[in-house]
Amino acid sequence: MNKKTKMKPATLLVHAGRNKSYANGAVNIPPYRSSTVLFDTLEEYQEVKHYEATFQDAVSSSFRYGRLGSPNSFALEEAYSELTGAYRSVATNSGMSAINIAVSAFLEQGSHALVTQGAYEPAAELFTKHLGPFGVKTQFISPSIGREISDLIVPETKLVYLEAPSSNTFEIPDIDILVESIRDKSQELGTEIVITFDNTWAGPLYFRPLEHGIDIEILSATKYVVGHSDAMLGLVACTEKTYQSVKNSSKNQGISAEQIGRAHV
């Protein structure tokens, strides 16, 4: 257990993401408004690309191209990982783009997804109107389904999308029962099912989904993190098993959060 894991939430909020390498000693990280980054040698550039490709530790501080992240977004991702208990996180330009990169990373033609009823309407439409034409089958489930969710899981089920409270009805599912039932059924079928969870309402200070067996926590940071209705932001907290797929999904779709640097000005 490192020093930060022992901190109470209020103390952790002060210290999270304060990596000195991002700020060159400045108390607050200066805004990095850059697209192109210079390297002294080709070898240095190739080393950074290698770290990105293999997702080694140095990827978090590898500033190679603005769309792929900057010290501003790296610090935010690091802070959010500390708050959620995640392996690593990915920052995006909105809550909806965070949902998109998280779910599309694990779905393909023929995949089956279970989505909670009463979910955020644009999220529901992502499944039905965007992913549907690509051959993804979506089935909506009651937030109170409990153990009966196992009856709906088939070999093609690749992802479960949950919210608590539900955006439209404020229903709160029994997360522990759902996770246990999903894991038991997937083990029985010999398949892998990714469980995603939109935690925008509670946030990591009041509920930590990854501690309850969730694979991916999604947050519309436009709400509490930004807090002033003057910018948009999304965050995806990942387990070690899911991070690489989500990071690639973000990179390959051209989604970034580089307005973070501009927001400082």
Language-model features and meaning:
Residues 2-49:
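N-terminal amphipathic/basic leader segments beginning at the initiator methionine
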